[in-house]
Amino acid sequence: MRKLLWLIAVTAIASIASCSRLTHGDAMSHNSAIPDTLRVGTLYSPTSFFLFRGDTMGYEYDRICSFAQSKGVATEFIIASNLQSLIAMLDSGVIDVIAYEVPITSEYRKQVLNCGSENITYQVLVQPKSDTLITDVIQLINKDVYVEHKSKYEARLRNLDEEIGGGIRIHSLDEDTITSEDLIERVAKGKIPLTIVNSDIALINQTYYRNINIDLQVSFPQRASWAVRKDNQALADSISAWSELAESGTADKQMLRRYFEMSKSGALPTGLSDAKSIISAKHGIISDFDIYFRRHGQDNGIDWRLLAAIGWVESQFRSDVVSWAGARGIMQIMPRTARAHGLELENIEDPNLNIQVAANIIKTLDHILRKRVSDPDERRKFVLAAYNAGMGHILDAIALAEKYHKNPNVWNNNVQEALLMKANPQFYNDSVCRNGYFRGRQTVEYVSNVSHYYSLYCSKIKK
């Protein structure tokens, strides 16, 4: 269940992605198979390793951190541009382990020693949920299926078409920036009827789009796992033994649920109306927390109605909300961010303190972006995007906009489009990017939603 790519200097990645402290001592830990600092190679992807709101995340990332912590060793992460680069790093001794899915095939077995939990994936059909689901590949005859041009999905679909005697209407999309996630979104929104993607990508996207079905497998299974050098049987055995125990534990089940089951939709719940976002326009009351929005807005030079709009979109003014990523409270503050602002986890859901930290963050983001985007109304969109995604991804999007002839000072149809490009390895591996893969669609939607409610509040509530 995972996948993707990029190359950054070792020291840069080590500084942002270490998930455990360096323990002093000999070159090797008390377990002679494991060095005191485990050098981990991986690729940016929605399943293995990515940055979100300043935190490092990913199913493979969490699991390798758990392994290292169980052994009492530190970690250093090195991000490669592709799987062959990772294997070359492993072979040359730059890294100790690949925490990314390496296919278990005769070809790869000549180069690496697979270890740890095996993950089995398939190519699956993505279709809208309905009462008339396609449940057999034969039913694809006379159906329109859309796939990426010259992709493994197109190759499999053409083979399948031959196997069943023809009749599948195959649409090979040759678009520069298209990804599997784009095609899944098009199915979810009714723009295309069917597509084919890997099951791990399908599982993650099902947490964003609950109206799709991914049950029909259309390929043979592919086995994959982590890998070490062929001469490092001791480390392989240690990882495999840990994996066997971890799979039955609560922590591993929680990781699976976090990345592959919990809803990640950035959209507001259905049934919410503009009227429900305001207690009383007549009396100038947006929420029960207006006193805090006003106080911390004034202290930080921020329109309190903007803070309220963020609070509504983030949590619908509920202080007990916890997101899949661990963000908490009315303003959905990440625990790591809270600690950086002196707010301990036990107090993170306190409305006053939660809103105070959010206001401080927004003030800081505005200060950083002021040098790049002079127009305050335009800059507000950038600030909202950075609040939702993390500043690093927005700076990447600005850099991509500059490189690919878009206006880096304008959000709509310019930097927002560049942010969407960061879901594609062609662009997040670009030399101007420093923060890797990012799924930008939810951030684009977030900016639009907050802007809508801010405009609504400004039209109905006095400052």
Per-region residue spans from a language model:
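Extracytoplasmic small-molecule ligand-binding "clamshell" domains
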Residues: 19-102, 106-110, 171-178, 239
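Bilobed "Venus flytrap"/periplasmic-binding protein-like clamshell domains
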Residues: 39-69, 103, 124-178, 283, ...
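Periplasmic-binding protein-like
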Residues: 42-46, 117-131, 200-243, 262-264, ...
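Extended ligand-binding regions for polar small-molecule ligands
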Residues: 58-70, 129-153, 201, 220-266, ...
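A ligand-binding cleft/hinge motif common to bilobed small-molecule-binding domains
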Residues: 84, 99-110, 158-159, 185-220, ...
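Substrate-binding/active-site groove segments that recognize
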Residues: 149, 320-346, 353-364, 450
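Export/targeting segments at the very N-terminus of extracytoplasmic proteins
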Residues: 263-317, 352-355, 369-373, 462-463
